[in-house]
Amino acid sequence: MGDSLSPEEKLSLITRNLQEVLGEEKLKEILKERELKVYWGTATTGKPHVAYFVPMSKIADFLKAGCEVTILFADLHAYLDNMKAPWDVLELRTSYYENVIKAMLESIGVPLEKLRFIKGTDYQLSKEYTLDVYRLSSVVTQHDAKKAGAEVVKQVEHPLLSGLLYPGLQALDEEYLKVDAQFGGVDQRKIFTFAEKYLPALGYSKRIHLMNPMVPGLTGSKMSSSEEESKIDLLDRKEDVKKKLKKAFCEPGNVENNGVLAFIRHVLFPLKSEFVILRDEKWGGNKTYTAYLDLEKDFADEVVHPGDLKNSVEVALNKLLDPIREKFNTPALKKLSSAAYPDPSKQKPAVKGPAKNSEPEEVIPSRLDIRVGKVISVDKHPDADSLYVEKIDVGEAEPRTVVSGLVQFVPKEELQDRLVVVLCNLKPQKMRGVKSQGMLLCASVEGVNRKVEPLDPPAGSAPGERVFVKGYEKGQPDEELKPKKKVFEKLQADFKISDEYIAQWKQTNFMTKMGSVSCKSLKGGNIS
């Protein structure tokens, strides 16, 4: 296909869906004369997850544009980065990566014979490369080396020398792989600019750098191999995919920090050029979107329900994962997977003294700062028909701004001056441009006629009074819940409305000093 494209068409394919390009003019000049040589490298650390489909889809674009593409399995980098891959499993993890990356490429129809695969240690241990590492270390400052790796190399209080070497080796890879361009995530930008600064100091040319956006995880933060709850593994079973998507942050009408929408935008749309929302005929039937922004708008306007969005992603994702699961269902690859990533629970613990602060944090209700609030004012969100912007007195000097998706469920007059229950220690986040400083907790019942009701504090409660689960009233709430730790999400899984309309956690009542928290009519409902 590349032979039949003009330089402009090749440029469009190479740069589509990228967040940033450094050296675009040089890229244009090369495309006028010959095919681009580009490489993508991946350190063989944690198990690859579904966000790896983002670079895979770009590799498909590069091949369509006629590029000569190299995939580097950066095994030495995996060890240098605070030994994320211990030396004794380094070779096994590299083999795992090679097999799983090839399976991913095959699942999206990329011909493997057009790619060059190489391991870092195939050339990084040579005399010439080692000498260049020493040459580079003589001109690079400690400050620049640490700054370059800040977004990629694990940050610790006392950095190891190996982590400071990491950016320099990645820069040298561009020369030793004989490429025109390096492709990676925007989190690599500081390493890319480091390479642009220091390669010329060794007499080597500055390369082009192509950067794709980072995909938020299911919790709204960056999707990470080291955060189990934030990502879907390529070998996760269908039931695990369903479970993780069910827990994913996907608030009605909220397109900010929405990991499910982000996955559609950055993974599913580039691969298929369309996305189908699967839903019952009574809700309008299936709908096909050929432009992501149309889907985002419908979600923001609550035309598309989070449940339908998650179910549709589940179906599309499993179609991508099925060929990979099938390939890894052989005895040889099962054995490789177990050896490369041994189950920590089956490993014998090392005999050491007690570690400081080694006990895991308890996920208990007292960590939530839940208070009685009084709604001072209610207005429609200026940019979202489905959202209210409320000012709520929670016993502080100033009322808090809280954004909630209640327009379709609760009339404005019913909220005005009402006592409500507010979760106050979530990390503030923007919802369609307005920063929300809390969550108004509600009961809800899903189904044909979805119903939502704010929780009611007991009569006589006052703004600022603490809401607690009986038996956990003495614990101290976290100052701010860290999104990565998912404390609220883990506790919320056991929130329920009892048959007596009482809000409960694990069948234990939510209370204030005046009595139990309740809702008007939604027995058996969920709480969010």
UniProtKB/Swiss-Prot annotation:
The keyword DNA repair does not apply. GO terms for molecular function: ATP binding; small molecule binding; tRNA binding; tyrosine-tRNA ligase activity. It is an enzyme of class 6 (ligase). The modification Phosphoserine is found at residues 205, 386. The keyword Acetylation applies. Residues 364-468 form the tRNA-binding domain. Trans-resveratrol binds at residues 39, 170, 173. Keywords: Acetylation, Aminoacyl-tRNA synthetase, ATP-binding, Cytoplasm, Ligase, Nucleotide-binding, Nucleus, Phosphoprotein, Protein biosynthesis, RNA-binding, tRNA-binding. It catalyses: tRNA(Tyr) + L-tyrosine + ATP = L-tyrosyl-tRNA(Tyr) + AMP + diphosphate + H(+). One of its GO terms (cellular component) is cytosol. It is found in: Cytoplasm; Nucleus. A motif ('KMSKS' region) lies at residues 222-226. PROSITE patterns: TRBD. Residues 338-362 are annotated as: Disordered. The modification N6-acetyllysine is found at residues 197, 206, 474, 482, 490. Resveratrol strongly inhibits the tyrosine--tRNA ligase activity. A motif (Nuclear localization signal) lies at residues 242-247. Tyrosine--tRNA ligase that catalyzes the attachment of tyrosine to tRNA(Tyr) in a two-step reaction: tyrosine is first activated by ATP to form Tyr-AMP and then transferred to the acceptor end of tRNA(Tyr). Also acts as a positive regulator of poly-ADP-ribosylation in the nucleus, independently of its tyrosine--tRNA ligase activity. Activity is switched upon resveratrol-binding: resveratrol strongly inhibits the tyrosine--tRNA ligase activity and promotes relocalization to the nucleus, where YARS1 specifically stimulates the poly-ADP-ribosyltransferase activity of PARP1. The nuclear localization signal, which mediates localization to the nucleus, is also important for interacting with tRNA(Tyr), suggesting that it is sterically blocked when tRNA(Tyr) is bound. Homodimer. Interacts (when binding to resveratrol) with PARP1; interaction stimulates the poly-ADP-ribosyltransferase activity of PARP1. This is Tyrosine--tRNA ligase, cytoplasmic. It comes from Bos taurus (Bovine).
